[in-house]
């Protein structure tokens, strides 16, 4: 497995996932700021030219949710995703996708101080999204009680990012949830890798 990665980007979420899964993988450094990026070769991995990208057995793809789901399903022993026959599978997929389909749009809404028509917007609106998420992660510690999943990893990463840059309100439930996620050994390992990659610049 290869993770196409650039430090100090949202690719950190996928890096964290690889450390959480605990399986062998290689990091392929991608300089998204270099002239000529994305190359045609990289667009065969991720057509949008963004990071992260992922490749396994010669097949490449992008999108954080896809990477997290692929890795979680590839290694069921990690219990990072309910198996397809598990009744919780649908709920897991809902919250795994929530970061990309809802949290990211409403964070932009918050940053830009805009309020699109919540009926027409596919993500609803900021207040409704935050309330739904707060309800989902309460009482915790994770979406499915004591079982940490890839959905928790993605949500924890998104909340941490959003609160750091003022795009998500620092509700106590969010602060506590993100802190629990960041306390995981896999997060610490990913931070160490990130620091080493930054130092290479």
Feature-to-residue mapping (PLM):
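GST-like fold's C-terminal all-alpha helical module
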Residues: 96-183
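Terminal-tail/helix-coil boundary detector
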Residues: 192-201
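GST-like domain detector, emphasizing the conserved glutathione-binding G-site
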Residues: 1-121, 134
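Residue-level recognition of oxygen-bearing side chains
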Residues: 66, 173, 186
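A late-sequence structural motif
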Residues: 184-185, 189-190
């Amino acid at each position: 497995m290869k993770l196409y990665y650039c430090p100090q980007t949202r690719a950190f979420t996928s890096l964290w996932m690889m450390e959480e899964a605990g399986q062998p993988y290689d990091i392929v450094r991608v300089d998204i700021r270099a002239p000529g990026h994305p190359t045609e070769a990289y667009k065969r991995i991720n057509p949008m030219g963004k990071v992260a990208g992922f490749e396994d057995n010669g097949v490449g793809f992008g999108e954080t949710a896809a990477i997290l789901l692929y890795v979680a399903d590839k290694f069921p022993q990690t219990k990072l995703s309910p198996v397809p026959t598990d009744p919780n599978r649908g709920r897991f997929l809902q919250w795994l996708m929530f970061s990309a389909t809802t949290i990211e749009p409403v964070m932009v809404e918050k940053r830009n101080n805009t309020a699109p028509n919540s009926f027409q917007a596919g993500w609803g609106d900021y207040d409704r999204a935050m309330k739904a998420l707060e309800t989902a992660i309460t009482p915790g510690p994770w979406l499915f009680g004591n079982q940490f999943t890839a959905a928790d990893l993605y949500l924890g990463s998104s909340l941490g990012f959003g609160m750091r840059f003022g795009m998500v309100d620092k509700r106590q439930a969010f602060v506590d949830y993100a802190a629990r996620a960041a306390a995981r050994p896999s997060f610490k390992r990913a931070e160490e890798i990130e620091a080493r990659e930054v130092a290479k610049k």
